[in-house]
């Protein structure tokens, strides 16, 4: 039995709790683990409890705390933590983010996430291929 540590990303989405985050679904489909926060405050609480996440996917249009403030606090706590900000209408930018996507592009988001953890991504892909071959 293959033991695999899958990357885990913190997704900060402004959709309300109880709804299903599209970003979360896209990332989980790629076989990554996801923690989800629905506000900047909740995100910082989760990040404090689970600081070993592989990266952060941040909605640029949070309501309670600006995405720039969330990103600055994360970088204060862990300067090397990768942060991907997804722009929303009216978004003015986030200077401390490592990546900024102009809109939600699932393929581009996954490309960035896979580049953050290439070895784990390759292992996941190989495992998926092996499982596909076993089926047939």
In which residue ranges do the predicted regions lie?
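A structural signal for short coil/turn segments at secondary-structure junctions
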Residues: 4, 29, 50-51, 78
């Amino acid at each position: 039995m293959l033991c695999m540590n899958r990357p885990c990303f913190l997704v900060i989405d402004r959709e309300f709790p109880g709804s299903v985050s599209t970003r979360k679904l896209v990332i989980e489909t790629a076989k990554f683990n996801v923690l989800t926060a629905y506000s900047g405050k909740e995100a910082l609480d989760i990040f404090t409890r689970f600081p070993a996440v592989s990266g952060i996917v941040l909605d640029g249009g949070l309501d309670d705390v600006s995405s720039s403030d969330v990103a600055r606090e994360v970088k204060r706590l862990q300067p090397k933590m990768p942060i991907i900000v997804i722009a929303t209408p009216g978004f003015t930018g986030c200077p401390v983010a490592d990546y900024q996507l102009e809109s939600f592009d699932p393929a581009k988001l996954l490309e960035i996430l896979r580049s953050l953890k290439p070895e784990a991504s390759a292992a996941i892909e190989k495992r998926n291929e092996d499982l596909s071959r076993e089926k047939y």
